[in-house]
Structure formats: structure tokens, C-alpha cells
């Protein structure tokens, strides 16, 4: 039987991997978005673990709202990246240094 500590350690490991992904790869915007999404999933897993072990469904319902917002964030972020790639022919973070193109 898995305890709450197992889920919290796994969530902390996923969160740490996403932070390392953000710090090691600052050039590619797609990898940055994937690392941020992994960070949100680690937090969601902790919400589900806490709500399961406390016997309350509020945390699990809250996860659905977080996933909805994360999906909208990803869609908007990828749409912005498509527009930037069409205008600049790159998705490198260093090349995106001005606000107007």
C-alpha cells in the first residue's frame, strides 16, 4: 500500500525535474512550456494525494479546474508560438527581445 509520503516524494521529484528543466534549457520555448506543465502536474498530484488521504473530494475537484486552466494556458502559449515562428522563423528565446514585430 502506498502511503501519503510516497506520493509527496514523487510530486517533489517531478517538481524538481521541472525546475531543472527550466534552468537548464532557457533557449527553447516549447521545452519551457513543457517544464511548466510538468510543474503543474506535480502540484495536482499532491492535491489528489492530500484529498484522498484526508477523505475530502474538494482537492480532486480543484484539480479539474487547474487542468482546465492549464489546457487553456497551453493552447494560448502554443498559438503565440506559432505566430512568433511565422514572423521570426525561430522559437529561440533570445531572438524574442522586443514586444512588437
UniProtKB/Swiss-Prot annotation:
The lineage of its organism: Bacteria, Pseudomonadati, Pseudomonadota, Betaproteobacteria, Burkholderiales. Keywords: Cell inner membrane, Cell membrane, Membrane, NAD, Quinone, Translocase, Transmembrane, Transmembrane helix, Transport, Ubiquinone. InterPro entries: NADH_UbQ_OxRdtase_chain4L/K, NUOK/Mnh_C1-like. GO terms for biological process: ATP synthesis coupled electron transport. It is found in: Cell inner membrane. It is a multi-pass membrane protein. It is an enzyme of class 7 (translocase). It comes from Cupriavidus pinatubonensis (strain JMP 134 / LMG 1197). The chain crosses the membrane at residues 4-24, 30-50, 61-81. GO terms for cellular component: NADH dehydrogenase complex; plasma membrane. This is NADH-quinone oxidoreductase subunit K. NDH-1 is composed of 14 different subunits. Subunits NuoA, H, J, K, L, M, N constitute the membrane sector of the complex.
Amino acid at each position: 500500500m502506498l502511503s501519503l509520503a510516497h506520493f509527496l516524494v514523487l510530486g517533489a521529484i517531478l517538481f524538481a525535474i521541472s525546475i531543472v528543466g527550466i534552468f537548464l534549457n532557457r533557449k527553447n520555448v516549447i521545452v519551457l512550456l513543457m517544464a511548466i506543465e510538468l510543474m503543474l502536474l506535480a502540484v495536482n498530484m499532491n492535491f489528489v494525494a492530500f484529498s484522498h488521504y484526508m477523505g475530502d473530494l474538494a482537492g480532486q475537484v480543484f484539480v479539474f479546474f487547474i487542468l482546465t486552466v492549464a489546457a487553456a494556458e497551453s493552447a494560448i502559449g502554443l498559438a503565440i508560438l506559432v505566430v512568433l515562428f511565422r514572423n521570426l522563423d525561430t522559437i529561440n528565446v533570445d531572438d524574442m527581445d522586443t514586444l512588437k514585430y
